[in-house]
Regions:
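Alpha-helical oligomerization segments with coiled-coil/rod-like character
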Residues: 1-84, 88-91
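Solvent-exposed coil/turn segments that connect beta secondary-structure elements
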Residues: 28, 51, 117-118, 141, ...
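Short glycine/threonine/proline-enriched tight-turn/helix- or strand-capping micro-motif at secondary-structure
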Residues: 81-99, 113-146, 169-170, 210, ...
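Generic structural motif
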Residues: 104-114, 142-152, 193
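Conserved positions in beta-strands of structured domains
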Residues: 113, 152-153, 180, 197-200
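Zn2+-dependent peptidoglycan hydrolase active-site motif and core
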Residues: 129, 146-181
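Residue "hotspots" at secondary-structure boundaries inside conserved domains
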Residues: 142-145, 182, 188
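Conserved, short, structured surface segments that act as functional micro-motifs
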Residues: 165-168, 186-230
């Protein structure tokens, strides 16, 4: 009888511990889902900001062309409406010819922790993530660098992504997000491999250092892994 009672009490304790464990896991899952939702909202906000920058650049280019009608025949129009000079046309062609040959957008070692497009979350079965670029994890102090010759057209700050730098290569654009210290300013011409700034290290996550990188042909999002050299 005593043995049966002890076994029953042990079973009750195990069941209680199991319920506590399950409750804890569910709580962590809810917290993770909330954090992922916040991150996705921040990513969407970044995407909208980039879209606004591209559209504003197109408007400015069109206005400049209208103000100089005598040179209008020397301009060509990209699919989105961005008016390119002859030099920009050539830069676009050069960029396109380097598909699969571009250097990595950072110095030093790295690993890709999030790929382009919609994908299944590794830990949450029914959660999908939509990434407009790729995320590269590296070491603290690593610099982001331009993958091709171009012009810095915009620098801005967004929640969750710190400072972003956009470099235009004709009608192609590369975006470098989650930077802290910035080495360039709007209007600067940059060369392939030129350092743009230091990638932010998060002190609340053991100095986790991640660069978010995008490539676009005007408003069309492209998979950076198809453009970078393997």
């Amino acid at each position: 009888m005593a043995l049966r009672t002890a076994a029953s009490e042990q079973l009750i304790r195990q069941q209680r511990e199991q319920r506590t464990l399950v409750a804890g896991l569910r709580k962590k899952e809810r917290a993770l889902k909330q954090e992922l939702k916040k991150q996705q909202q921040q990513a969407d906000a970044l995407g909208r900001r980039i879209q606004q920058v591209i559209e504003e650049e197109a408007r400015k280019a069109a206005a400049a062309a209208a103000a100089k009608k005598k040179n209008a025949t020397q301009k060509s129009t990209a699919p989105s409406g961005y008016l390119m000079s002859k030099d920009e046309e050539q830069l676009s062609r050069n960029f396109a010819q380097n598909r699969g040959k571009l250097p990595t957008p950072l110095s030093g070692r790295y690993r890709i922790i999030a790929h382009f497009g919609t994908q299944q979350h590794p830990d949450l079965k029914y959660v999908k993530i939509n990434n407009q670029g790729i995320d590269l994890q590296t070491q603290p102090g690593t610099r982001a660098r331009s993958v091709f010759d171009g012009v810095v057209t915009s620098i801005f700050v967004m929640p969750g992504y710190n400072t972003s730098v956009i470099v235009r290569h004709g009608n192609y654009l590369t975006i470098y997000s989650n930077l802290s210290t910035i080495y360039v300013k709007t209007g600067d011409k940059v060369k392939t491999g030129q350092e743009l700034g230091v990638i932010y290290s998060d002190p609340e996550e053991d100095n986790r250092t991640v660069l978010h990188f995008q490539i676009r042909k005007e408003t069309t999002k492209l998979d950076p892994e198809l453009w970078l050299k393997k």
